[in-house]
Amino acid sequence: MPRVKRGVQARARHKKVLKQAKGYYGARSRVYRVAFQAVTKAGQYAYRDRRQKKRTFRALWIARINAAARQNGLSYSRLINGLKKASIEIDRKILADIAVFDKATFTVLVEKAKAAL
């Protein structure tokens, strides 16, 4: 059987991994074996956190809406219930944005929610 030589492919694969590990500390950016583990783990964290990011942002929006609603004398849950009853369909992302940057509009929304309760 002829000898199989894969030096070119191995070199390319190693270069690709080391390029991905650029900026890592110590051996993680220089030694292929360590870099491969670091890059693999980083990929797992990235995959997991892309999903967690959605939950984290929703929690942030809710915290902001709750804080603004309480300044207007209403809890978060009662505000959302009131908005649903007033058939105001506005998602939490936009509602949080309004609460932070346009307090007058948010106050109007709170008043409409209070009236619908």
From Swiss-Prot:
Alphabetical list of PROSITE patterns matching this protein: RIBOSOMAL_L20
GO biological process, one term: ribosomal large subunit assembly
GO cellular component: ribonucleoprotein complex; ribosome
Stored Gene3D superfamilies: 6.10.160.10, Ribosomal protein L20
Entries under PANTHER family matching the protein: 39S RIBOSOMAL PROTEIN L20
Protein family according to the UniProt entry: Belongs to the bacterial ribosomal protein bL20 family.
Protein name as catalogued: Large ribosomal subunit protein bL20
Biological source species: Photobacterium profundum (strain SS9)
Gene name of this polypeptide: rplT
